[in-house]
């Protein structure tokens, strides 16, 4: 993401997982794990939406962690359709999470679906994520679970990969608000600064000393 990005591997259930970490300029105030879109459609941790979410996290004083799902980049294994990728995310979360810091979770498209699965798993274990953001959730393609009421859900009005209607159908039974970006497609072309602002605004109250 920048010259200071630190790259290493974490042991995962399918082998080595390629990880990238970006640090804030000041004191670390938490950890944000950002999950990338569908591997079979070219999704990687260097996707521009993923990097935007990571930059927003860093701006709030969070250590931003990205990684490649199994079979992507230098990560071992092969695409598993969701369950294996959730296991990958859980392995990275366990490796980078610090019990003394807030833990935030964000995902884009397929990564947002995996984020719902990981969030449910963490909650069941008694160690839920403190913040959750879902961008372009692939609700029409994968069975996303219910999420906490505090979750930020962002979708493009003209998304032709995952129709807005599919996300509204998922959100409706939960009475979950959805932030719709007018005119934005799935990849938020020309709207990435706004996307960064939306995440920063949603999470800023938890980090007031860095966001005021």
Label each residue range with its predicted role.
Residues 147, 152-155, 159:
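Short beta-strand/loop motif that positions the catalytic acidic residue
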Residues 184-196:
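Catalytic histidine-centered segment of alpha/beta-hydrolase-like enzymes
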Residues 1-27:
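N-terminal cap/lid segment of alpha/beta-hydrolase-fold proteins
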Residues 79-98:
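Alpha/beta-hydrolase active-site loop
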Residues 107-115:
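Gly/Ala-rich beta-loop-alpha elbow adjacent to hydrolase catalytic centers
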Residues 157-162, 186-187:
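Acidic catalytic loop of the alpha/beta-hydrolase fold
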Residues 25-66:
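Short, surface-exposed "cap/lid" segments of acyl-processing enzymes
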Residues 149, 163-171:
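Short alpha-helix in the alpha/beta-hydrolase fold that links the catalytic acid
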